[in-house]
Structures are given as structure tokens and as C-alpha cells.
């Protein structure tokens, strides 16, 4: 579970309406949602992002309404991991349930600048800032959550478990 990409910083208290505005909730198609990811924060934000880039957020990322569309839109934008100072609890569970890797790093998020090149190892709980040479640590993804991620989300995980 190692990912290399460019860091894209967003602020504090980014709610699910900023991640994917309500006017785009007419679908659950990841590509359609991804094309409008973060549209409530910055029009055209998606044009700056490449596959496997990494979102870095301040505190309370994903607050607001409980909707699966928010993590689906992030994944649809090609972003496999969000690193944040902290997450809203309901978003944290929804994110993993949809297959999005989420890592909490506390105040160390300040060491990850916009545009920095990062290498994230979610299994080890390490984030290397290739740009600065600094490595920060966080709690690794727990084994149960890794199982969900390996299957691509909770629904596929349950299907896999039931088939055995």
C-alpha cells in the first residue's frame, strides 16, 4: 500500500458539500463525481490533479453531511489517499468503507506543503516528503481496515467474506 504523488493542500473544516456539492449528487458514478471533486471549494480544482496525487488537509476534514459521494468523488478524481490533521468521524468510516485510504498525522500535516512530492506507506504508517527529505509517522492502517481497502471497499469485502 505504497503511493507516490504530489501533495495538494486544503484547509480546515472542509465539509462534504465543499468536497462534492449537492447539485452533483444525482449519480454515484466515480468518474462523474471525480470530475466535480472539490468544486465547492475551488472551481476547476480537478484540473490540477493527476492520478495518485495526495490530498493533505487541516483538521476536521469531511465534516458536515454523511454521504458516500464525498469519498467516491475523491477516489474518482484519482486520489487514493487523504492525509489530514484530523477527520470528521463519519467521513473517516465512510472513506474506508468506499476504499479511500485515510491517515491522521496531527500537527505534522504542516510538514507537507502544497506541491511537495510525497511517498505514503499506509501499512507502515510513514509519509516521506521527498521534496524536504523529512519522514513523518502516523498510525498504520489497522489490519481489519486494510482488508476492506484490499477488496476496494466494505461492500466488496463483505461479498468476499460471504463467498468463503
Swiss-Prot record:
Q: Name one GO biological process term.
A: L-leucine biosynthetic process
Identify a single GO molecular function assigned to this protein: 3-isopropylmalate dehydratase activity
Entries under CDD domains matching the protein: IPMI_Swivel
Which of UniProt's keywords are assigned here? Amino-acid biosynthesis, Branched-chain amino acid biosynthesis, Leucine biosynthesis, Lyase
The EC number(s) given in the record are 4.2.1.33
User: Catalysed reaction per UniProt?
Assistant: (2R,3S)-3-isopropylmalate = (2S)-2-isopropylmalate
Which pathway is it part of?
Answer: Amino-acid biosynthesis; L-leucine biosynthesis; L-leucine from 3-methyl-2-oxobutanoate: step 2/4
Is-annotated flag, keyword Transit peptide? no
Q: Which family does it belong to?
A: Belongs to the LeuD family. LeuD type 2 subfamily.
NCBIfam families documented for this protein: LEUD_arch
- Which function does this protein serve? Catalyzes the isomerization between 2-isopropylmalate and 3-isopropylmalate, via the formation of 2-isopropylmaleate.
Report quaternary structure and partners.
Heterodimer of LeuC and LeuD.
What protein am I looking at?
3-isopropylmalate dehydratase small subunit
Task: State which gene encodes it.
Answer: leuD
